[in-house]
Amino acid sequence: SDKPLERINYIPYAGAIEMITLSSFVEYIKANVDVMADKMIVHVVSPTEVRLYSALDADRKREYLVNVRAGLPDFRFGSFIDHENFVIALQSKFAPNEDRDLVLKFAGTVEDGTVAQYGDDGVTQKATVKTGLASKADAVVPNPVTLIPYRTFLEVQQPASDFIFRMKSANGVQCAIFEADGGAWKNEAMDNIKEYLKNELTDLKQFTVIS
């Protein structure tokens, strides 16, 4: 034949199930509702994705059974957003800690049109904040700050990392936070996911967890 031939695959493969939590993934495995290969691979792909594969079969192929993508709130790091939405996002999309409360307090009392830059480093800022019903004072914008955004599966500990907090006056006060840890949080998050799954599946020896 002058056309490429392909071997007919007699082994049917299931389509991947979509999930959004690690707990539902563990429940699915422990329920033993589907027949699986003797050896299975749980692959932690990223801080927001886990996949379940079979080991290689006779045709050197893997069955892709489950895809878990974390259902997380969205936050635009590195982008200035208006003051009110920033405060709401900080309260709803970040775990409480001392620095979060500090940023919230500062952002909640700053006056429009008073954000000013000073010094030679181009990083430090100051602004006028309300210190009482009728009193005001200049204050330094806190930097850097350690925050804990919800950015991996909620079943595991959320990594804390450093951020640069910036403000500007443009159609009202606008705020932004910029990641300052070089992405190191991703490795910590993936390690946390791996440990969680290893602990949950410790009695099921056919499952190997990798990242």
Residue ranges of predicted features:
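Membrane pore-forming effector domains from diverse proteins
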Residues: 71-76, 112-170, 176
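Surface-exposed polar/charged interaction patches
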Residues: 14-17, 28-35, 92-97, 110-113, ...
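Long, compositionally biased interface segments
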Residues: 156-211
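Alpha-helix boundary/N-cap detector
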Residues: 16-20, 77-81, 85, 98, ...
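Membrane-inserting effector segments that mediate pore formation, membrane fusion
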Residues: 76-126
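Positively charged, hydrophobic/aromatic-enriched amphipathic segments
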Residues: 1-23, 109-113, 122, 126-139
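A glycine-rich, hydrophobic loop/mini-helix early in the fold
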Residues: 52-80
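An N-terminally focused, membrane-permeabilizing/fusogenic/translocator signature enriched
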Residues: 1-53, 204-211
